[in-house]
Amino acid sequence: EAGQADEVVRILQSAGVIMLGEQATVIDGVGFAGAKGFIGGFGRGELGAFGEDAIKVFVDEARNEARLLENALRSLRTERAVAVLHYAPIPETVEGEPLEIYPFLGSSRLAHAIDRFDNVKAVVHGHAHRGAYSGHTPGGVPVFNVAQFVVEPAFGRPYALLEI
């Protein structure tokens, strides 16, 4: 934060946190694939690569983040995997946010990448601080918005426990 991202990463890694940025890891037989994800909207409202170059660059970033997630998931050889994102892959977990900002909260491209893999048993994301706790990808994978402002009111604590 505040231009100190590298320092934050260094501190977290020195404390034993595994940074998933565009890669995967396995803990106790469960695979975790991470990507930031990106924005662009959901379903029929998803922004397409047309018109001005700036829009095409924007859409390319959303496509690239979905590819990074897909590659991280593909690298896992586990029966159970969790996709870890910042941005939402479905509109259901951003419900509660103003409709006008939905396109800036996530992208369906992420859900399409997730649904390519049968071993993905859950997805977690943040970013939508006023969103809903849970939903499913079109392929049926459970999605959880674990933003603190969503989780704490739901559970009375600033974290959720998921059984994978």
Regions found by a protein language model. Give the residues of each.
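Active-site-proximal beta-strand elements of phosphoester/diester hydrolases
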Residues: 29-41, 82-86, 142-148
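Active-site-adjacent helix-turn-beta-strand microarchitecture at beta-sheet edges
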Residues: 9-12, 17-30
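Metal-dependent catalytic neighborhoods of phosphoester/phosphodiester hydrolases
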Residues: 1-15, 94-98, 131-139
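Binuclear metal-dependent phosphoesterase catalytic core
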Residues: 26, 108-121, 129-164
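Active-site-proximal segments of metal-dependent phosphoesterases and phosphodiesterases across multiple
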Residues: 48-50, 76-119
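Binuclear metal-dependent hydrolase catalytic cores centered on His/Asp/Glu-rich metal-binding motifs
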Residues: 30-78, 103-108
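Histidine-centered divalent metal-coordination motifs
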Residues: 86, 127-129
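Structural motif
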Residues: 30-31, 80-82, 122, 153
